[in-house]
Structures are given as C-alpha cells and as structure tokens.
Amino acid sequence: MEHASILARKSFWPRLLAALALLAMLIVGRYTYRDYGITVDETVERDSTLINYQYAFQTLFGRDLSLSDQPLETYKDRHYGVTLQMPTVMVEHLTGFTMPSRDIYMLRHLWTFLLCLSGLACFYLFLERVLSNRWYALLGLLMLALYPRFWGEQFTNIKDMVFMAACCWALLATALSLRHEGKWRWEILSALLFALCANTRVIGFLFPSLLFGYRVLRDGVLTPVWKKGGARRFFAQLAKHALALLLMLVCYVLVTPAAWASPLTFLIETFQEFSNYNIWNGTVYFLGDWYSGNALPWYYLPVWLCLSIPLWYLAFMLAGAAGAAAFVLRSRRRLGSALRRVLLGPGRWFVLCLIVAVLPVAAAILMHSTLYNGWRHMYFIFPELVVVALFGVQWLFRLLRGRRWPRRILAGGLAALLAGQACWIGWMHPFEKFYLNPVGQSMCDLLEKDYWYESTTAQILHILEVDDSRRICLSVNAFSSIPAFNYLAAKDARRVYIYDSYTYTDWTPIDYIIDESCGPVSSTFPGFTPVYELRCANGMLLSTIYMRDEALAERFGGQWPQQ
C-alpha cells in the first residue's frame, strides 16, 4: 500500500493556474486547429479507422457497413490499434458519411488536440502525486505543453502525439494503482487506461509490465511480505498482481477489434511483428547524408534529441541525472538501504521515468531498429524526460535552500523561458512543429524538416490564389499533393489536377512541382523555374514552388507575382 500523500505544500494557486493554463490552451486550439495542413499519414490513418470501425460495427450489430473492400482479418496494418480514433468515424456515421472531406480532417485535428489536452491534464495530476509540491507540477505541465514541436504536432499527428498523451494516462494510472492498491475500481480504471495506451502502440505494454515488476520486487524484496505472512501470503499477493495484469490484457482485447476473433494468436502476432519491425523501407536524411531507415547510425536518436529539445530542458535533465549520481555517491557505503528508501519513496518515480525514457532508446540502438523521420516515434519518452528535468529543478532549489534571492532568480528565469517559448510558438504559427534549438537551427539544412509534407497544403493554396487558370496541373512529387486535396474547398479541388510525373508531356501537362525540403535544398527540375519559397518566420526553408518556364511566361510574363 502506498503511504499518505507526499505533497508537502498544497497551495491552491498552482492548481488554479494549471486549470487556467489548460483552459487557455483549449481556447487557442479551438480557434487555430484549422490553420494546419493535412499530412501524408492522416489519410492512411483514417482508412485504418474505417476498416476497424466497419468490422466492429458488423460484429457487434450484425449489419453490413460498406466503408472499405479490405477485410480487417487480412489488413496489413491490423496490428496498429486505432480505438482512440473511432469517435471521429462515429461522428461521420451520424451524418451518414456525407461530411465534406475538409470537415472530416478538421474534425480529426480537433479530436487529436483534445486527446493531447487530456494527456496534459493527466500529466499534471500525475505530477501532483509524485512531486514535493504543486508548483513543480505546474512547471512540468507548462514544460510539456509549451514544447514547440508538440504544440504544432498535437493537431495533425494522430499517431505519435496521441500515444504520447496515452502514456501520460498510463503514468497517472500507475500512480493511482499504487496509491489505491487493493481497491478494484481503481485497478479497473487503470487497466482500461493501460489498454488504450497499448492499443495505440504496442510498447504501451511497458507500463503495466513495469508496475507488475515493481509490485513483485516490493513484496518479495523491499518489504518482504513472506516474513510476516509466510509463502502463502506472498503468493496470494503475487496472484492479485497477476490478476490486475490479466485484467489489463482483457481490456486490451476488448478495445482492439482485430483481436476479437483470436485474442491469443493476435497478441503473439503483434509482439512478433514489432519485436523485429522492418516493414518500412524508406530513406532518412540525417546530417547531410541519406540513410535507409533500418541502417541509421547509432547516434541518430541522441543527436535528434540534443538538437530539437530546448537547451534549458537538457540542462535540467542533466541536473536531475547529476542529483541522482550525487545520491549514489553519498550512499555508496549503504547503497542497499538507500536504494530501498528510494524505491519505496518519491524517488521511485524518478527511477520509473528514467527507465521509460532510456530503455526504448537503448533498445532501438542495440537492436538496430527501423526508425522513421525525426524522432517522432519516440515522442512518448518526452513526458518522462520532463519528470527527470523536474527532479533536477527540485534538486537545484534544495541546494539553494535558505538563499532567497538566488531561488527567486531561478524561479523568475524559468518563468521567462516558458514565456519566451509561448511567444516563439505564436511567432512561428502554424509551423511551430519545426522547432530546433539554437544548435539545431545552425545546422537545419543537414536535417529533415517537413517530412510530413504539411507545407504542401499552404503551397497549393498559394498557387490557387495567384494563378486563376481553370486547370492547375501539379506533379505528385512523392505523393505529397494528394492529402492536401482533402483540405481544399470543392470549387478549388475541381481546378487541381495531379500527375505522376516530373516531365511535361501531352499526357502529363504539369505546370507546377512543389519540392518539400526533406533533404538538400538544391533540387532542380529541367524546364522549371523556382518561383516561390515558403519559409518559417525564422527563415527556415520548408518548400519551393517550381513552375514550368513556358507557363510562367504565358501567364505571368516570366515573373511570378510578388505579394
């Protein structure tokens, strides 16, 4: 059983400010969610959701629903859970699947944002339960919410960002399970949250597994129950913990339609597929070179983390690690009892978050795992890294105990840094997801940027605004233009024609090529002239419009209109 709350200061103000911050984010998100373009994976994710929804509806209600010709049983992506995306298709169903394409994807943007906002709320509640006072919890909430890459991606990235939010749910579920141990209504709630997390990404099984392992370690070693109650009591406790784990597996099957027909077989297939994932054979641009996704250098993830996380976050993460190292050095003569004290007290949350943050990265490096663009597939470790940083902040404040002005300067500096990030987000909107820290910004041309091809939407809208021709003929250019179709109003979509070619012929009369900066920015296309560059507010190049020379001369006299 967990002891009484460790909150030393129960000030009302941090909780009020946290509620106001979440409300402000909700208002801002409500009025900006339509500002973001449509990315390449959004259409794929919707297709997966339709296939799962069709199967679930037919299985539960015995009625046909013709949404896709692809049966779920043989669908290649059936092991990717989409339960948290189902409500968007339910809304489509209520309208008879007659919603305009743009409204469908804007609904998904809003829903993704709301899921991420719920993750932020759960993260704050988790921090309240594991840190020494609520001011640290408020700081953690703002550090996570105002991380620029996350703010921009929480509308369009319905996979990685939703999984990040689900991991925040899982952190809270872990805290609730330990605080209310033995109360099955809390175990059921935690099992459901764990199941939704694992449904979103199979690595979500890490949280209930760590919880089970901790309970066994606690009852068997740290506070051995068999010393007082004998082996029978220990095995009774072990059975109870195993039952909680089994409850989570049952919930996972219930929320995963693809597992309904054969749960055990599906679980085995899922673990086999993702233990050696090598389906994706794309290429990644990293530090000026192209690599296959399954042959990246070992330092790929560490470098991306160091270039795209604010430097002051990294500094406090190092402070947290330094504080832990200092504790180990101080306790080296009585390390066993010190570790026991840590694992039974607030320090266990530092250990948990450190494991969740380090283990997946270490596994990816050691197993040479296939990795996608950037580090988006590891976004779920960021809340845990924030917790490590918060322990660093807490350690520094303890070092400054009794020194009023240094503590005030540190607190004021943190507030100023967070305010600066909020201003940066507003300045870069709607391209805040391309954030790099000053070191990363200095070498941005050596890294992938718009690998989601989101800027294509803005570029097509710009072409439609400038060129009033009846037909706007585009090159497909790595399929990036097709998702943008779903953003266009019907009258605009009727003007746009897309061809799978980079060359003008009678059969492929393309006038425009949109080149996204997913690699070197020196792309050239014979017979086409670069006419417009889309850049972020900080000057980072996102994409370039190329126009066929003859069309440029005919429509604009050889000079693209400057606005």
Task: Please identify what each model-predicted range represents.
Residues R78, V82, M86, F97-A121, ...:
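Loop-to-helix entry region of an early transmembrane alpha helix in multi-pass inner-membrane enzymes
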